[in-house]
Amino acid sequence: ENKTRIFLKKIEKFFPFIINHDIEIKSNNTFPHSSGIASSASSMAALSSCLVDFEKMGNTTMSDEYFYKKASFIARIGSGSASRSLYGPIVIWGESKAYKTSNDLFGTDISNQTHDIFKEFNDTILIIDPGQKKISSSQGHELMNKNPFSSQRYEIAKKNVLDLKEILKSGDLDHFISITESEALMIHSLMLTSNPSYILM
């Protein structure tokens, strides 16, 4: 697939051995492709893990910590959400004042700073339409960058992460639900006010 070829080209400098090998990729995913529920995150996380595993064959001293950090770093290049898909159960991606070890390069596991109630959460996804979404993630991100309200959105998101740190520690479900619902509605509001505008729900 074209997206995979572009991804492999981007990461050549981190895996020089790719240039000298033919890579055959066989994958299967229970999520519908490009429907807006992060199928690319799981696929890029899996592919990145395989590549670092391949690298580890020539470096038997590679630590588990380094393995997962590099896999997360590489996965992020293919899909931002993929950086959070390699360990956990609760991972933050992106630098935030709330978490000292957080950064923009790879996901940071915050499970040990999180109340047990959140570790019992599961997703249930009802697929109504398995078709592909009309606006790709990359197109959506581009529209967000040009949105006149994006700067306010970023500031609110930063504040929400700070608030969520205490909420995740305490297990305060009411405030957790309030923030997550507000986040979802705000994202959809930005979509409606982008140019061109679109509806994802």
Regions found by a protein language model. Give the residues of each.
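ATP-binding N-lobe of GHMP and related small-molecule kinases
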Residues: 1-35, 49-65, 112
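Short acidic, glycine/serine/threonine-rich loops at helix termini
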Residues: 36-39, 87-88, 96-97, 136-140
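Alpha/beta catalytic cores of group-transfer enzymes, especially the acyltransferase/condensing modules
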Residues: 66-118, 190, 198
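Long, hydrophobic, well-ordered secondary-structure blocks that form the structural core
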Residues: 33-85, 92
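Residues in well-ordered beta-strands of folded domains
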Residues: 26-28, 94, 127
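Domain-wide signal for the mature, well-folded portions of proteins, strongly enriched
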Residues: 16, 46, 56, 64-75, ...
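Catalytic-loop motifs flanking and including active-site residues across diverse enzymes
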Residues: 3, 39, 43-47, 156, ...
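C-terminal nucleotide
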Residues: 112-201
